């Protein structure tokens, strides 16, 4: 209605972990220089060199140029099995699974998936026949399953240099035909607390946006603010009574909330005294009516509250490493779009008039969806009608291939109603909408038990992290900006506590557990990353080029080999997270890498070793740090170098 806020000045926002690349189409392009470098590193182990064109199944969307080691293993397995059984390549490729445990191999093939008779006997026979084919290092039969292990020499030579060359691009892929996705997330209500549900929506939505980009999509991050409705009438009246310009400029969200609380208390007193139709209520209705009618003064007041709030939100979001391309809101949905929605309701015979209101009866398609009012008897539209209008506008203006709504599971019924209505309006693109839900945070409050504002939570996490850091005077003296680092550690603690389990699960917000440097926490991830950065700094005599071209022939320590196997899994982990839309998939993987790094770090040293031993070891540690950096950035964390 009054113009969507498009953020052209990206410097206002926190730097996106991928922002060193072009906004659209930054994904790995594998240019000629990279391809040549990689091919020089490839070793000839008697396997056919495959191109990405060979992958004609669910793995077709691979980057041009070299493919990841586990993809080569997939191809070698499918070729070998096809040669001995005649089974179609695509059936084998789609049946192969990643493993959750290293002792189960690098890839797993459940033989029942490819419909062979007597899968146990066949597994035993094939394990013998396949043991020396291509990059397959070992094959084990376990009941009806075949476990495949990469050839150790190929594993190390193809994985470690690959990571060091690709750096931040490792694990990502470039789609041949880039699709567009709109991710709507966060969506706080102006003048109301930024509560725990908004926090979850914000960090999960930020992760999903990063994940879609990593998988080759063009992403539009949208914040759909609660910036319209009767509360703005109350807010305007309240600000006349209790507003303070200086406080508004300094703390807009907090001050508007305080004003809103006070005016609601006054309103409650009026209602008790039987004056609800005049006084505050009447003034609020009058202001909002003027706002809807486009009154210049009302719009000026509303726009000021909204603009100051957005400016404050941007500052707060930057601490979470979150940015938005569009700040939209309920106010942005045009009357034309809502009228178009109502016209389609009537045209498709979806609405019935009940007591003057327009109602859609969804029980004819699903009993649980019930009836939905789309227009009140006085002619005003409801939230759902605005959402329908907004979806229509977004399809017209943004031309998305998919739109994702990151909204609490408390809204599951509402989102099902919304999607069903769009489907019955015969919008073909209704199938491209997805609701990503999540559970509730229990026990989330400040230590004083006050109303929760996001800034307060972030401040408390930072202060607690800083207090822990100050316990080690020697280490904190080496940190350039302890306050900033503490803020990053505090944010990491909040994000990882949230993302450790499946997003649909409720969880208990626990300050002490969240900020612990022991166990699987955000600070532990940061500690591992900074530890590896320290190793790189103390080994700076060895250049990146030396690490890329290291001789790995003598790298046989089992712990380091297991670490490289984990690093080789990262592209598959990204794919699995993309399929499930679960941040916990990435978090679980990160802790596996950290635990393996820790077991290696204690026993397998770089310092004091001759170059032919130190360089390949350092290459593995440096590749590990890069993968940690990539995965942490994907989750929305900013990895620290010192802490």
UniProtKB/Swiss-Prot annotation:
It holds the Pfam family tRNA-synt_1d. One of its GO terms (cellular component) is mitochondrion. It is an enzyme of class 6 (ligase). InterPro entries: aa-tRNA-synth_I_CS, Arg-tRNA-ligase, Arg-tRNA-synth_N, Arg-tRNA-synth_N_sf, ArgRS_core, DALR_anticod-bd, Rossmann-like_a/b/a_fold, tRNAsynth_Ia_anticodon-bd. One of its GO terms (biological process) is mitochondrial arginyl-tRNA aminoacylation. It comes from the Eukaryota. The keyword Ubl conjugation does not apply. This is Arginine--tRNA ligase, mitochondrial.
């Amino acid at each position: 209605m009054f113009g969507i806020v498009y953020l052209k000045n990206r410097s206002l926002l926190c730097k996106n972990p991928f922002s060193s690349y072009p906004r659209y189409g930054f994904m790995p392009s594998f240019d000629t220089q990279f391809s040549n470098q990689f091919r020089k590193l490839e070793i000839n182990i008697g396997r056919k060199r495959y191109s990405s064109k060979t992958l004609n199944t669910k793995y077709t969307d691979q980057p041009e140029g070299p493919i990841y080691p586990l993809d080569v293993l997939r191809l070698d397995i499918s070729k070998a099995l096809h040669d001995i059984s005649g089974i179609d390549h695509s059936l084998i490729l789609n049946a192969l699974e990643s493993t959750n445990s290293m002792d189960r191999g690098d890839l797993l093939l459940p033989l029942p998936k490819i419909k062979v008779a007597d899968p146990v006997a066949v597994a035993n026979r094939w394990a013998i026949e396949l043991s020396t084919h291509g990059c397959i290092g070992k094959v084990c039969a376990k009941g009806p399953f075949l476990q495949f292990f990469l050839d150790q020499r190929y594993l190390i030579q193809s994985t470690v240099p690959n990571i060091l060359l690709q750096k931040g691009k490792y694990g990502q892929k470039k789609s041949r035909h880039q699709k567009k996705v709109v991710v709507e997330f966060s969506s706080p209500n102006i003048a109301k607390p930024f509560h725990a549900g908004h926090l979850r929506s914000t960090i999960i939505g930020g992760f999903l946006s990063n994940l879609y980009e990593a998988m080759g999509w063009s992403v539009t991050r949208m914040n759909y603010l609660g910036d319209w409705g009767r509360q703005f009438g109350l807010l305007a009246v309240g600000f006349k009574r209790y507003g303070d310009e200086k406080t508004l400029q300094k703390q807009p969200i907090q001050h508007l909330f305080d004003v809103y609380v006070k005016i609601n208390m006054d309103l409650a007193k009026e209602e008790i005294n039987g004056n609800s139709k005049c006084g505050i209520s009447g003034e609020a209705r009058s202001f909002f009516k003027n706002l809807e009618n486009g009154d210049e003064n009302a719009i000026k007041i509303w726009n000021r509250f909204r603009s100051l709030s957005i400016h404050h939100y941007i500052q707060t979001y930057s601490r979470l490493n979150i940015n938005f391309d569009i700040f939209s809101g309920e106010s942005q949905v045009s009357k034309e779009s809502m009228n178009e929605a109502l016209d389609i309701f009537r045209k498709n015979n979806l609405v019935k008039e009940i007591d003057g209101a327009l109602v859609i009866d969804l029980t004819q398609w699903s009993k649980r969806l019930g009836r939905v009012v789309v227009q009140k008897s006085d002619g005003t539209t409801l939230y759902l009608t605005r959402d329908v209008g907004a979806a229509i506008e977004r399809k017209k203006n943004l031309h998305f291939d998919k739109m994702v709504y990151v909204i609490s599971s408390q809204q599951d019924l509402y989102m099902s109603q919304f999607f069903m209505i769009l489907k019955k309006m015969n919008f073909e693109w209704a199938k491209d909408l997805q609701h990503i839900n999540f559970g509730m945070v229990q026990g989330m409050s400040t230590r004083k038990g006050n109303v929760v504002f996001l800034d307060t939570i972030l401040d408390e996490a930072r202060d607690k992290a800083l207090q822990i850091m100050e316990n080690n005077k020697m280490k904190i003296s080496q940190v350039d900006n302890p306050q900033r680092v503490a803020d990053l550690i505090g944010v990491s603690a909040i994000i990882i506590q949230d993302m450790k389990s499946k997003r649909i699960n409720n969880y208990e917000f626990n300050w002490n557990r969240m900020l612990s440097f022991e166990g699987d926490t955000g600070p532990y991830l940061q500690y591992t990353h900074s530890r590896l950065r320290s190793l790189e700094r103390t080994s700076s005599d060895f250049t990146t080029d030396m690490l890329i071209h290291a001789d790995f022939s003598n790298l046989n320590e089992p712990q380091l080999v297991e670490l490289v196997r984990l690093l080789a899994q990262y592209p598959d982990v990204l794919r699995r997270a993309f399929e499930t839309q679960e941040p916990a998939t990435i978090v679980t993987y990160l802790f596996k890498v950290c635990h393996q790094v820790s077991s290696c770090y204690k026993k397998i040293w770089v310092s004091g070793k001759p170059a032919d031993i130190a360089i390949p070891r350092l290459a593995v540690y440096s590749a590990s740090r890069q993968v940690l950096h990539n995965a942490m950035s994907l989750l929305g964390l900013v990895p620290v170098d010192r802490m």
